[in-house]
Structures are given as C-alpha cells and as structure tokens.
Amino acid sequence: MQIPSKLKPYYENIAFEQEDSKMIINLGPQHPSAHGNLRLILELDGEQVVKARPCIGYMHRGMEKMAENMIYQEFIPTTDRMDYIAASANNYAYCAAVEKLCGLEIPRRAAVIRMILLELNRITSHLLWLATHALDIGAMSVFLYCFREREYVLDLIEKYCGARLTHSSMRIGGVMLDLPENYLEEMLVFCDKFPNDLKDYEDLLDDNRIWRLRTENVGVVTKEQALNWGCTGVMLRGSGIKYDIRKEEPYLLYNEVEFGVPYATQGDSYARYKVYMQEFRESLKILRQCATLYKDTPPEILATHPEYVSASKEQILTQNYSLMQHFVLITQGLKPPKGEVYVPTESPKGELGFFIHSDGTGRPYRLKARTPSYWHCAFFEEMLVGTYLADVVAIMGNVNIVLGEIDR
C-alpha cells in the first residue's frame, strides 16, 4: 500500500535565524489592516523588520484555469472578482485582449462610454484607497468623507450597469447599453463638486503633523527598485518615472483627450499620496472631455461582426439568420483565429494586462492575467526590510494592493 507523503507548508522551510535577539511574528491572514487574506511573516530585531516574507494563496480560485473551460463571453463576470474594487478595469482589459485577437474595432460611442466607466471606476478605487489608508494611520474623518463621495460615484455606475461592485459592464465588441437619460448631466454635477471635496481632504492631511510623520521618508522606493521589481502605476510614478500606458500606448480615445501624468521624485509614501490626489483631478478632466465627445458620436454601441458579435435584440426577434447566429455564439462561443496576444492597460493600481493563446476554438487554450498587485506584493520582501513594525501597516496601505487580483 502506498503511503501518501505530507507536504510541508513552504513557510516552514524559511531559513529565519532562531536567535534570542530576534522574534518571528505573523501579520495576518486574519488581520483588519492586511486589506484581505494576506499573511506576512516578519522577523524582528526589536521593533525593526530584518526579514519579510509575504505568504499568499488564501483567496486562490483558479481563475486562469477556469477561463480555459469557459467560452470567451462567459469569462467576463469572473474578471469582476479579480480587483473587485475596479471591476470595469478588469472587464475592459479582458475584452480589449479578445477584440485584438479577433481584429474587432468597437464603435466610437462604445469607446467613450468605456472611458467614462474606467475613469469613474478609477475615482472609486482611489477613494477607497485614501479612506482605508487614512484609517490605518488614524485619520477617521477622512475615511468617512471619502465614503460619502464614493457613494455618489457608485450611484452613477449603478445607474448604468445595475451593480455597484461587480459591474460586468462591457461586452466583447462594445458595451451592453447606451447611457441613460440625464446621465452626463449628473456626472458633470459631480465633476463640478468633487474638486472642493479634494481640497477638504488635502486641508486635513497635507500639513497634518501626524500624517507627514507617518508617510514622509517611509516606504521609500528608488527608481532602480521600482524597475527591478516590475512596479507600475503610482508605485512607478511616485519614484520619478513618468509612465502611464494611457499616454505611452493609447487605447480607446485617450489620444484625443488632454490629461497630465502626475509624478513625484521622492519615492516615499507621502509622494505617492500626492500623486494619487492629482490623479483624481486628471480623471475629472477626462470625464468632462468625454461628455463633449459623446454628443458627437453615432448611436452604435456594439461592433457589427456576425462571426463574433450578436445582432441587436430587435434583429434576433425578427430575423431567422440573426437568431441562429446568436444561438451559435451563446452555445459554442466566438472562435478567434489561432494566435496569441497581450494587451496592457492602465488600471487604478498599475499595469493590468491579459495574455490569451487561442487554438481556434470557442475557449482560450491559455489565459494569463498580469496584475499589478501581485508584483507590488512580492516587493514587500525588500521594501519592508529596515522599517519599523509600526510602519508596516502604513506601507501596506500606501502600496494599494487587493488580494483578489494577487491570488486569482
């Protein structure tokens, strides 16, 4: 009879020095400041961290393997559950990869609606980051104010797609719906009001002595470290590298709108906070321009391509060919040509990209997601060394990770 061998958990094999002067502690995975099921194994010399090892996998759901057993359209709602704070960013990155694989060009109005959803989603993600980061450091008032404004933006998103968190708002070839009546007017009301709220946040934090003591020269990331560890988004721009995929490799209509790329050179937590605050304003600038672009677009919101995209509901109900084509797409899935593609996008947390390998069937042969939080979490191994235990939670909150896209 074969006796099964019990595999030791990998963290039991970590060669931490067992000395009287050192102490090993576990932060998480059940910890309110871990921002999810993250476990950090820390070796301390007094109050100073001398070794750190992130231990992930507590939320692993096998999403990439699940994709291989789903038709392409079926996987869209699953992407919501990666970075569940920015579901539309996940929806878009995946749809853009499939569209590139199929050679689909989406209608102009669909591109504008996608940009509106992405920038609203960026604002909600940044607001949640600021709220929880401030709460970790002790600024309770900012937490409450951020959630107040976030509710207004979530109402706008809910008015479009019916959901506040898991949007499933995009379709391969475009979007599911046109904007509701008076939607742009309500959005512009928010765009006019929100700058005053941002000023309130900055009045509370910018020159707050405790805030600056907890963020200045804390969690410093050099240019070299940011590049070596694959950092993207604000983690990269906060260290002096002015890189934004929306500018470097424009997608949708980002090449037709004017916006800046905020960056800082100090590389510490305070510098990243200032970059985030400026990004709010750039998103508002983009939203105002999208409202103008929308008015001059034709009404089509889905690409016309019977092989990959279903016809309109009216055609499906009245035309036999459209009904049959719709039936085949839903039961067998769209079938892109053989090949592989990688599409990078600028999510609120950094570079989010999907690699898809197609074998010509209705299901991807291989799907791989490149999520920013995964790379930033790995960086804790170097970033936390030399810091004090009291600053670990502040640094984790400042880096802005979400465990849903780390574990997948």
UniProtKB/Swiss-Prot annotation:
The keyword Transport applies. It is found in: Cell inner membrane. Its main location: membrane. Its EC number is 7.1.1.-. The keyword Translocase applies. GO terms for cellular component: plasma membrane. Signal peptide: none annotated. Keywords: Cell inner membrane, Cell membrane, Membrane, NAD, Quinone, Translocase, Transport, Ubiquinone. It is a peripheral membrane protein. It is an enzyme of class 7 (translocase). One of its GO terms (molecular function) is quinone binding. It catalyses: a quinone + NADH + 5 H(+)(in) = a quinol + NAD(+) + 4 H(+)(out). NDH-1 shuttles electrons from NADH, via FMN and iron-sulfur (Fe-S) centers, to quinones in the respiratory chain. The immediate electron acceptor for the enzyme in this species is believed to be ubiquinone. Couples the redox reaction to proton translocation (for every two electrons transferred, four hydrogen ions are translocated across the cytoplasmic membrane), and thus conserves the redox energy in a proton gradient. HAMAP family: NDH1_NuoD. NDH-1 is composed of 14 different subunits. Subunits NuoB, C, D, E, F, and G constitute the peripheral sector of the complex. Belongs to the complex I 49 kDa subunit family. This is NADH-quinone oxidoreductase subunit D. It comes from Campylobacter jejuni subsp. doylei (strain ATCC BAA-1458 / RM4099 / 269.97). The gene is nuoD.
